[in-house]
């Protein structure tokens, strides 16, 4: 086999410097490496031995950079995103911001249509009993599932994001969550009683076993995903042990939904269970993102040969959110910031952010993914970001001092003392 070697002067991820030496009288110019000594782990390379050298395979070119051959040479950016910018908890969201910042065009990925001649609506029904807690529920189905390891490019990208690759189906859901910021869940279709999904509140003291094998005691404030007979998932947090994907799965139901953020946060705390999915849901997701995410997942399933996507989509969207419209108030923005930015310049900033201006009634139409833009000060903040914080003049707080009048207490106090 072909293995990686560290030469004299190289350092391991632990900081140990590799030096020339002699081993049993034979001169050694370096050290052959295990996967851990290359800065990775068996979590991301499950075929690596528990101890010993990692065989990189016959495709590895002798003399090439081992880190590059393993795909570990990629640059990883870490962003500290404030909780109000949930749209940036995804690759697409960061790309949108980067395009606006660097004056580039932002183009959403073109998702190819998927699905055979069957109709998913003939195979599953969805009933949302509480539209306030479940704003949208999208479902698609995949049959003839072929579980297998994901391709290396996907495993590497997941590993770079700190996610352990498992199999093609699980990896696709995680990959799309990173791309679109939309959590998804997969259920074994053959375990769904009556081929029916019901989104309802839990019953007080209802006990439910989650995927991690733990029994959770619920109450009526928590939202459940159920079939015709039983609960199969704790909405937005974790699926159930009774509907999990196993190696024997043949047909799968994909779920992409938009649950109420405050409810998910409270439910996760009550259940003592916080997951990557609940962490995203609790910040409040864009309901219009669910459809694109589930279609992207189905595109990847066909692309990777992981199964046959059934045509159509079940889409329950009880109450579509009203479009947010704010008045365009450039004078107020400048007053708040202490700047003198022209109206035209402000509108250029807003256009980059996909905020549409309606000249007829002087209003700004806020895109659904910008849930943080609610009032005048929020719009002023957007102006400040693109105008440049460094250009905003530094001024000290000022106020007008007046002598004022003495209160009755101050007037009467000297009299009393006399």
Predicted feature residues:
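Short "domain-exit" segments at the C-terminal end of structured domains
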Residues: 413-418
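RNA/tRNA-interacting regions in translation and RNA-turnover enzymes
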Residues: 1-408, 412
């Amino acid at each position: 086999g072909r293995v990686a070697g560290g030469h004299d002067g190289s350092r391991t991820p632990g900081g140990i410097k590799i030096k020339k030496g002699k081993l049993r009288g034979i001169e050694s110019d370096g050290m052959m490496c295990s996967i851990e000594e290359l800065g990775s782990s068996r979590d991301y390379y499950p075929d690596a031995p528990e101890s010993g050298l990692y065989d990189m395979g016959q495709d590895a070119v002798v003399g090439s950079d081992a880190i590059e051959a393993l795909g570990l040479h990629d640059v990883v950016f870490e962003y500290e995103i404030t909780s109000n910018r949930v749209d940036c908890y995804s690759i697409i969201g960061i790309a949108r911001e980067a395009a606006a910042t660097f004056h580039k065009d932002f183009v959403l990925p073109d998702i190819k249509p998927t699905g055979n001649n069957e109709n998913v609506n003939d195979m599953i029904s969805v009933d949302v009993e509480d539209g306030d807690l479940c704003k949208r529920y999208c479902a698609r189905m995949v049959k003839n599932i072929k579980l297998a390891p994901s391709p290396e490019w996907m495993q590497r990208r997941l590993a770079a994001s700190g996610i352990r690759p498992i199999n093609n189906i699980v990896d696709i859901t995680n990959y799309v969550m990173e791309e679109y910021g939309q959590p998804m869940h997969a259920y074994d279709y053959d375990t769904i009683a009556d081929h029916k999904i019901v989104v309802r509140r839990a019953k007080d003291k209802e006990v439910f076993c989650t995927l991690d094998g733990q029994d959770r005691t619920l109450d009526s404030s928590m939202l459940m995903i159920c079939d015709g007979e039983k609960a199969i998932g704790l909405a937005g947090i974790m699926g159930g042990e009774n509907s999990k994907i196993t190696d024997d799965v043949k047909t799968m139901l994909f779920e992409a939904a938009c649950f109420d953020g405050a409810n998910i946060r409270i439910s996760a705390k009550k259940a003592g269970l916080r997951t990557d999915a609940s962490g995203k849901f609790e910040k409040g997701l864009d309901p219009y993102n669910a459809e694109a995410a589930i279609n992207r997942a189905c595109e990847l399933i066909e692309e990777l040969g992981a199964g046959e996507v059934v045509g159509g989509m079940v889409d329950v969207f009880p109450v579509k959110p009203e479009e947010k419209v704010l008045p365009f108030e450039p004078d107020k923005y400048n007053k708040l910031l202490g700047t003198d930015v022209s109206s035209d310049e402000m509108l250029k900033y807003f256009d980059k952010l996909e905020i549409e201006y309606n000249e007829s009634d002087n209003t700004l139409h806020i895109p659904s993914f910008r849930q943080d833009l609610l009032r005048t000060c929020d719009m002023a903040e957007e102006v400040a970001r693109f105008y440049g914080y460094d250009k905003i003049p530094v001024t000290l707080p000022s106020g007008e001092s007046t002598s004022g009048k003495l209160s009755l207490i101050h007037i009467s106090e000297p009299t009393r003392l006399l």
